[in-house]
């Protein structure tokens, strides 16, 4: 029978082990490309359950081989303060809280850093445990990665359509070109899908999508180039 002291010791070593593995994982991904994420595997499982053929359309490309407008577009669309915050946009969080209090439609306050932490290290569940781990990994990547690296991993790992992950894959499948050849308008259209890339498509954009694309193109004028 385990004593309280034994249980405490086991929990202590589990915590130390988790800390060591998580820090090591973040350090490894500081240099190593992210080829597979938990979400990719989950989507494959969902395809099998639904009787569909599982597939992962993904091709890693370094940031310098992407259109210079792609980081600008997602900053304008997803995280206007990406270059200045340290992982959490507290102004956006306060605004979202006020909107919820007034009964307005909930706006997203998740930063690119938070989304990257979730995409690479966690599952898309909405539990408090996952949210806590997301905050933890966000702090780690902000401490151990550069902003350029966070953006590079984000643009290579994020879901951009059914079975499509990363900017190179969506460029090839939806625009018939490489990520480096995407135009300013292409990048704005891709960014417009990111709140829900399974609902909004850059291949067959709706009227709403075209309107959102124009808004993002306008906002891009106020975002500096990342490289």
Which role does the model predict for each range below?
Residues 2-227:
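Juxtamembrane regions of bacterial inner-membrane/periplasmic proteins
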